[in-house]
Structures are given as structure tokens and as C-alpha cells.
């Protein structure tokens, strides 16, 4: 191989290595974003479950009160 070909090959390899490093950094950022979103999603699911339980409790109370009103009428 000529020196020119080796130089071109070295340049391409260096560019490829730089691209790989950039992609690794982007991947790490995306992993962190994913982790943050997963935690937020978990919190929202827990909050949703709590609100559904509160709604069910209120529905029971309202149903009970409506039953009392109907029995008095």
C-alpha cells in the first residue's frame, strides 16, 4: 500500500472512531433521559392509582348518601 492510501485509511479510521465516541455520548444521554422518564412515569402511575382509589371511595360515599336519601323519600 502506498503512503497516500495509508494516510486516507488512517483519516477514515480516525473519523470513524470520533463518530463512535459521539454516538456513545449520545447513547449515554438518551439512557439518562430514559431513566428520568421511567421514574416520572412510575410516579405518575402511583399518583393515578391513588386518585383512582380516592375516586372509588368518593363514589361509595355518594352512593351511600343517595341510598339514604332514597330510603327517606
From Swiss-Prot:
Q: What does the annotation say about its assembly with partners?
A: Homodimer. The ends of the coiled-coil dimer bind to each other, forming polymers. Interacts with FtsZ.
Enumerate the subcellular locations listed in this protein's record, separating them with semicolons.
Cytoplasm
Membrane-crossing residue ranges in chain numbering = none
Q: Please identify the protein, giving its name as recorded.
A: Cell division protein ZapB
- Keyword Coiled coil tagged: yes
Segment Disordered: which positions? 30-50
* Top-level division of the source organism's lineage: Bacteria
Keywords in alphabetical order: Cell cycle, Cell division, Coiled coil, Cytoplasm, Septation
- Residue pairs linked by disulfide bridges in the UniProt entry: none
The species this protein belongs to is: Shewanella sp. (strain W3-18-1)
Q: Which gene encodes it?
A: zapB
Family designation = Belongs to the ZapB family.
Q: Which residues form a coiled coil?
A: 3-69
Q: What does this protein do?
A: Non-essential, abundant cell division factor that is required for proper Z-ring formation. It is recruited early to the divisome by direct interaction with FtsZ, stimulating Z-ring assembly and thereby promoting cell division earlier in the cell cycle. Its recruitment to the Z-ring requires functional FtsA or ZipA.
Gene Ontology CC annotations of this record: cytoplasm
Amino acid at each position: 500500500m502506498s503512503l497516500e492510501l495509508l494516510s486516507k485509511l488512517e483519516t477514515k479510521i480516525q473519523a470513524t472512531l470520533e463518530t463512535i465516541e459521539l454516538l456513545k455520548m449520545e447513547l449515554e444521554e438518551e439512557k439518562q433521559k430514559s431513566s428520568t422518564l421511567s421514574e416520572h412515569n412510575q410516579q405518575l402511575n402511583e399518583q393515578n392509582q391513588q386518585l383512582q382509589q380516592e375516586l372509588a371511595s368518593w363514589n361509595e360515599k355518594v352512593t351511600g348518601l343517595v341510598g339514604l336519601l332514597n330510603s327517606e323519600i
